[in-house]
Amino acid sequence: MKKQIATACICILSVTAFAQQAELTAFNKERERISRTGIKVLAGYSAANIIYGSIAAGQAAGSNKYFHEMNAIWNGITLGITGIGFLTAKKEGILSYNESLKKQHNIEKLFLFNAGLDVAYIAGGAYLKERSKTTTKNPLRLKGYGESVMLQGGVLLLFDGIMYAIHNRHGKNLNKMGEKLQLSASGNGIGLVVKL
């Protein structure tokens, strides 16, 4: 009888562990999908800005010429970065709960860090625009570049904020999975409780 009870317990734990791993794999695939979609959106925005900025810079005058010129330059760099990110992104294998948690925290921290950089871009653009008012050396270029950098920093801040919010909301599913596990210790040993 003891063998049958032990076998039944092992079977239940095995089925539960398999179900949790499948749930974890689905979670990780969704995180990858969210990131790939974000990269595609940013790449599309950048490509459109390169095309439009290049055309508009040739037709504009004054600070507007430099505004469009910087939009094309800025988004050329952004498109290069997103292209590298897309090409180097690899599908992950099966990750443990702890590995998944680490990946989730890292992606959220990345978007928060990027948001900080975006604020610095906006401040840098504001500095260039303000400097254009007091310099005699190409003030139109400083004004146009400053306005462009502020705009692009603002767009990136919006993008990074949205991506952080989406990943953060998705990460709450991982927390729910973790709540199903409870590790306890006593003087007699260590136990793992799996809530079914």
Model-predicted segments: where are they?
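Alpha-helical membrane-anchoring segments
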Residues: 38-47, 67-70
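Long, highly hydrophobic alpha-helical transmembrane signal-anchor segments
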Residues: 45-65
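Membrane-water interface of transmembrane alpha-helices
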Residues: 80-95
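Extracellular/lumenal glycan-associated surfaces
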Residues: 122
